[in-house]
């Protein structure tokens, strides 16, 4: 179920403070965060936010089409290595 509109988007306070201070200083430094649950707001446009995926920080450049999504959607936590093309061991004759 989506979040109620009367509540507004959720953004962690520490991340919001970093984004606002970066906007005031007009700096484009990478903002490092562990807050995957925070929603992307228009104030974050043009910034590169390094989102933690459980192992490392993945840089995410925020564009206009990402507004309204959560930061964790753009930093995948699982690596898919692919299926084996032709597995002769598991096949019965």
UniProtKB/Swiss-Prot annotation:
Pfam families: Ribosomal_S19. GO terms for cellular component: cytoplasm; small ribosomal subunit. One of its GO terms (biological process) is translation. The keyword Protein biosynthesis does not apply. InterPro entries: Ribosomal_uS19, Ribosomal_uS19_bac-type, Ribosomal_uS19_CS, Ribosomal_uS19_SF. GO terms for molecular function: rRNA binding; structural constituent of ribosome. Keywords: Ribonucleoprotein, Ribosomal protein, RNA-binding, rRNA-binding. It comes from the Bacteria. SUPFAM superfamilies: Ribosomal protein S19 (SSF54570). PANTHER family: RIBOSOMAL PROTEIN S19P FAMILY MEMBER, SMALL RIBOSOMAL SUBUNIT PROTEIN US19M. Belongs to the universal ribosomal protein uS19 family. Protein S19 forms a complex with S13 that binds strongly to the 16S ribosomal RNA. This is Small ribosomal subunit protein uS19. The gene is rpsS.
């Amino acid at each position: 179920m989506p979040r109620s509109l009367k509540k507004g988007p959720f953004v962690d306070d520490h991340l919001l403070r970093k984004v606002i201070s970066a906007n005031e200083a007009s700096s484009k430094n990478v903002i490092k965060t562990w807050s995957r649950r925070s929603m992307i707001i228009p104030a974050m446009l043009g910034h590169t936010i390094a989102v933690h995926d459980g192992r490392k920080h993945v840089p995410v450049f925020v564009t206009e089409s990402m507004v309204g999504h959560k930061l964790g959607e753009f930093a995948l936590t699982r690596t898919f290595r692919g299926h084996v093309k032709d597995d002769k061991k598991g096949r019965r004759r």
